[in-house]
């Protein structure tokens, strides 16, 4: 019973719950960005490059033989995933910049009175 109680306390701590929410939101955000790239950016980029569809770009290493499918290097999908990554990284970078601007700067730690007094005494003794 002690193990279950410890696990519940661990799982209900703010950091774990915050991380879980972040992972879920990040997953949903990744799907949105993937859709943005594959459904909006890639077709426009295809039109600009003369009707090329990146999803179909591949090198055929071995032709299909009977029931065995062709062996291919799908570099078009790789390009699409790189674009996904760049957009996600940029969005996260912008969010972090906004969060850092919104956060209040940490107040400078002031020295305790005794430490300040000793520093002043030291400085006075130095000057004599």
From Swiss-Prot:
Lineage: superkingdom: Bacteria
The organism of origin for this protein: Haemophilus influenzae (strain ATCC 51907 / DSM 11121 / KW20 / Rd)
Family, similarity comment: Belongs to the MscL family.
Role: Channel that opens in response to stretch forces in the membrane lipid bilayer. Forms a nonselective ion channel with a conductance of about 4 nanosiemens. May participate in the regulation of osmotic pressure changes within the cell.
Assembly with partners or alone: Homopentamer.
Bilayer-spanning residue ranges: 17-45, 75-94
Alphabetical UniProt keywords: Cell inner membrane, Cell membrane, Ion channel, Ion transport, Membrane, Transmembrane, Transmembrane helix, Transport
Membrane topology summary: Multi-pass membrane protein
Topological domain ranges for the Periplasmic compartment: 46-74
Pfam families recorded: MscL
One GO term of the biological process aspect: monoatomic ion transport
Coiled-coil parts of chain: none
An MF annotation (GO) of this entry: mechanosensitive monoatomic ion channel activity
Topological domains, Cytoplasmic: 1-16, 95-128
PANTHER family to which the protein is assigned, alphabetical: LARGE-CONDUCTANCE MECHANOSENSITIVE CHANNEL (PTHR30266:SF2), MECHANOSENSITIVE CHANNEL MSCL (PTHR30266)
Subcellular location: Cell inner membrane
A cellular component term, taken from the record's GO annotations: membrane
Protein name: Large-conductance mechanosensitive channel
